[in-house]
Structure formats: C-alpha cells, structure tokens
C-alpha cells in the first residue's frame, strides 16, 4: 500500500496556497498575520513550509486559509 505522506508532499494544497496568495499580492507574513486575526497561529515560516508541501495543514488551518485567500476549499485542492 502506498503511503500518503512520504516526507516530501505532506499536503495537497501548497501550490494553490502560493498561487492564490500571489494573485492577491499578499506576502507570506501578511497571510500569517491575517490568519492570526482569525485566531489561527501559523508563522511565516510555516506558511513557507505549507507552500513547499513540507508541512501538514490542519482542518482549522484549511478553513482559515481559504477564508483569508477568499477561495473555496475545493479551489485549494484543484
């Protein structure tokens, strides 16, 4: 059976988080700050690791990221 998490690709949304963040001309720090305003604490370094797919994303983080980036959760998975 194939492993879902192999140490390299630890999430499925990283490339789209980067895509939508850049479309909104938002820095990683601004995304981090916006998440914090929602009570979700993801430092700038963690945003970088999410985008590089080297960090997992919790369900709460997923909902908050989608809200801040103004996209549906489904769009993050495309």
Residue spans for each PLM region:
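Conserved hydrophobic/aromatic packing and binding residues within compact polymer-binding modules
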Residues: 17, 31-32, 47-50, 76
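DNA major-groove recognition helix of helix-turn-helix/homeodomain DNA-binding modules
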Residues: 54, 58-75
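Recognition helix of helix-turn-helix/homeodomain-like DNA-binding domains
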Residues: 37-56
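A detector for short, charged/polar N-terminal pre-domain segments
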Residues: 1-12
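Helix-turn-helix DNA-binding elements, focusing on the entry/boundary residues of the two helices
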Residues: 17, 28, 44, 59-62
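Short basic helix-loop element that most often maps to the first helix and adjoining turn
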Residues: 15-36
């Amino acid at each position: 059976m194939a492993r879902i998490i192999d140490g390299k690709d630890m999430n499925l949304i990283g490339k789209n988080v980067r895509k939508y963040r850049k479309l909104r001309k938002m820095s990683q720090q601004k995304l981090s700050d916006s998440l914090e305003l929602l009570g979700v604490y993801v430092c700038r370094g963690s945003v970088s690791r999410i985008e590089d797919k080297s960090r997992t994303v919790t369900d709460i983080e997923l909902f908050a990221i989608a809200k801040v980036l103004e996209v549906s959760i489904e769009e993050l998975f495309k």
